[in-house]
Amino acid sequence: MNRGERLALRHYRRRGYRLLAANARVGRYELDLVLRRGRRILVVEVKEKGGDAFGHPLEMIDDEKPRRVLTAGAGWVAAHPELTGLEVAFEAAGVRGRHVERVPLT
């Protein structure tokens, strides 16, 4: 897990989420974080930038990334039948310094 993923995980843990998987491989895709809080599963794509010189970290998400994250996330959840019936949501987390900004991917 890289620095940005660790900072994002800390951010989500403070909000009551617990980690189910990090850097989980689903076919040729990778899911940065898969989290759970109550009956909600949250799949998170994490992007990090060290400074402001080259824009915001969330600008690194191209038009195809949400589709890939949704496809991989659905595959990961399907492979875990104990999670059937839970709400599944998808987000991107942009990490800059110690600040984490969250945006929905759906």
Language-model segment annotations:
Residues 1, 5, 61-66:
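Short, conserved glycine- and acidic-residue-centered signature motifs
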Residues 1-22:
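Acidic-basic catalytic patches of nuclease active cores, encompassing PD-(D/E)XK
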Residues 6, 70-71:
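Generic alpha-helical structural signal
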Residues 12, 31-57, 61, 69:
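Conserved catalytic cores of phosphodiester-cleaving nucleases, focusing on short active-site segments
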Residues 26-29:
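Short acidic/glycine-enriched loop/turn segments that link adjacent beta-strands
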Residues 71-78:
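A short, N-terminal amphipathic alpha-helix
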Residues 79-106:
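Domain-level recognition of nuclease-like catalytic cores that cleave nucleotide substrates
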